[in-house]
Regions:
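Charge-rich interaction segments
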Residues: 125-159
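Hydrophobic transmembrane signal anchors and adjacent membrane-proximal interface regions, especially
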Residues: 69, 84, 150, 160-161
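Single conserved hydrophobic/aromatic residue that forms the stacking wall/gate
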Residues: 160-171
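Alpha-helical cap/lid subdomain in secreted, periplasmic
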Residues: 2-132
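Intrinsic-disorder/low-complexity coil detector
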Residues: 12, 77, 139-141, 164
Length: 172
């Protein structure tokens, strides 16, 4: 999240996809960090459209969608779920998990193409259903303590060393 400003928001995007559902556990702490990222992006200068993507562990269906979904509903943000689209195909045996992921977590090229098709289907559906101009977003109060929204990234390379190393004298 701390890299969002330099790596994403400085590019002034008008559309952002946020996907963190597999690397996070389904806990209050990760819901709070996720909300911080969502708020940082959603309230940034360009006020981009935001789509939340919930990926999944393809061996067991686990993800943080339960907690992250609470954030999506609180901010009325659209979300797409691989747990309800791709994972059932894996469970049913119509897709072999090794065809789409080498480690049940990170998609390979075929897995990325499949995830992209789910996202594209959703975006095409939204485009068809709602071509009206959107009003300015209303930012509700945070759902969590939200201690991460204003987080920043410090790099050690920019620190200046201001003290001399100490010398330990050995006393015998």
């Amino acid at each position: 999240m701390a890299r969002a400003e330099a790596d994403l928001l400085s590019k002034e995007p008008d559309f952002v996809i946020i996907e963190f559902s597999v690397n996070d556990d389904s806990t209050e702490h990760f819901m709070e960090t996720y909300e911080g990222l969502v708020r940082k992006v959603y309230t940034s200068k360009t006020k981009p459209a935001v789509l939340l993507v919930h990926n999944v562990f393809y061996n067991n269906g686990a993800n943080a969608q339960l907690m992250h979904g609470r954030i999506a509903r609180h901010y009325n943000l659209p979300a797409v779920s691989m747990q309800s689209t791709i994972y059932p195909e894996v469970v049913a045996g119509r897709i072999e998990n090794r065809e789409i992921t080498p480690d049940d977590l990170h998609p390979n090229d075929a897995g990325h193409a499949l995830v992209a098709s789910v996202i594209t289907y959703f975006l095409d559906k939204v485009k068809t259903e709602d071509a009206t101009e959107q009003s300015e977003p209303d930012y509700p109060t945070p759902l969590t303590k939200n201690t991460y929204e204003k987080s920043i990234r410090h790099q050690n390379l920019s620190l200046i060393h201001i003290s001399e190393p100490t010398r330990l004298d050995v006393i015998s």
